[in-house]
Amino acid sequence: MAGAYETKQYRNVFAEYGYSEEEIEKRVQETFETIFHGSEEERFYHEAGEDMGFMEDTGNHDARTEGMSYGMMVCVQLDKKEEFDRLWKWTRTYMYMDEGPGKNYFAWSCALDGTRNADGPAPDGEEYFAMALFFASRRWGDGEGIFNYSREAKAILHECVHKGEPGHPGDPMWEPSNKLIKFVPGLDFSDPSYHLPHFYELFAEYADEEDRKFWKGAAEASRAYLHKACHPDTGLSAEYADYDGTPHSAHQEIFGRHDWYYSCLLYTSDAA
């Protein structure tokens, strides 16, 4: 069955439940304004200086690549270029690592003043950054420097695939032998909530030509993996899972603690 990307027919479940287009749009815009420009008690986007901004993780009082990339995705979907560029510049200024084993990846957590809390990445941030940047390129066109969105996206994905090859130190974010995303580059197991096969289908169209076959294979591998990693009755996934889909016993061999709802949302998004 062809999905929305092929048919150009995008479902609106709110409309299917009887809400008018005006009601839906009003609620979306009100929610954006609350999160990005509401009162100090409500919003978790904050401007920093003249041209940067960050998304605060309110439970941990830091900024994470996960939240920054989600914020960028919201902005590009809603045509909010100023906020998008502010988030991306903050990310590139404070989170981007230019040396060490994580060179060209992004530190997964920073304090709200930009000080790094970590020297390693979390791959879900990189994949969302890349997709948001590709969308920005297609919506607004490429600019200069770090705002050459498509170039930045391709560079991120190149690192994710090719680290660990001769002359390219470090570890890739996708395991080359099975094309599955890792929990972190240096460990050999996955996180079901990271799997975005619908993103990988688009990476197979937008990424560097040499890597497009890889991304097509990653989409197929990811879909097969989710069938193994999600419980057959509940649909819940473990926090972490080995490459065969079984819960990763060395860490958290449990279902439905933190990230199970991500997996549910992601595989339903892929189906759409």
What are these model-derived regions, one by one?
Residues 252-260:
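Penicillin-binding protein/beta-lactamase superfamily catalytic region
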Residues 134-233:
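Aromatic- and glycine-enriched pocket-lining scaffold segments that form the walls
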Residues 261-266:
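Ligand-binding pocket segment of bilobal, Venus flytrap-like solute-binding proteins
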Residues 267-272:
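Conserved small/polar residues in nucleotide/adenosyl-binding loops
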Residues 1-66, 77-112, 116, 168-176, ...:
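Low-complexity, Ser/Thr/Pro/Gly-enriched N-terminal "stalk/linker" regions
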Residues 61-68, 116-141:
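Aromatic-rich carbohydrate-recognition surfaces in CAZymes
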